[in-house]
Structures are given as structure tokens and as C-alpha cells.
Amino acid sequence: NLAVVAVFFEQGKANPALANLLENVPERDQNVAIRAPFDANALIPSDKDYYRFNGSLTTPPCSEGVRWLVIKDPQSISAEQIAQFEHVMGENNRPVQPLNARMVLTK
């Protein structure tokens, strides 16, 4: 079993918490170590309300058994920061899946 904490981003102001991470993003098919510590907690807003559901991985093999915690409050990201991620990752999202009688709980 696996737990994933997911944060939504919407285009707006640059996100300072992502700035250090993006400075160290490798080119596609290249691995690099992030030199400076990255505080992932800086991406979690003070309002920690979330949605919770059991689902699957978003990348192959798309295995079941994943507990998703999706933060309700979207964080800001600039168009330039989005472009940096897209340059390296391309389009890597999985199509939205049917709910299949899954319960989505909220806190």
C-alpha cells in the first residue's frame, strides 16, 4: 500500500517554494541530485483540508492500493514555472478515471 499527498496548482504568481526545485530540474532522461534541501512542507497550505479516496497510481502499471490525500486549497504557480515542468516532463497525466462507486471523503 502507498499513500500520496497531492497538491493542485493554478496559474498565477510564481511559487517561491518551487523556485529552488526548478533550478535543479534535469533535462529529460537525465538524473541529478538536488543540491539544496527541499522543504516539501512549504507546498502545503496553512488550510490543510483535503479530499481522501482509494485509487491507483497515475503512471504504469497504474496499480491499485493507493490512498490519495488531495489538498483542497490550490497553490499558485507562474506560467514560466509551468513551462519549466512541461519542458522536462512533457504530457504525463493519466486521463481521469471513472469513480466506480469509490467514496471520496472530505476533511
What would you call each of these model-derived segments?
Residues 1-107:
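Extracellular or lumenal secretory-pathway regions
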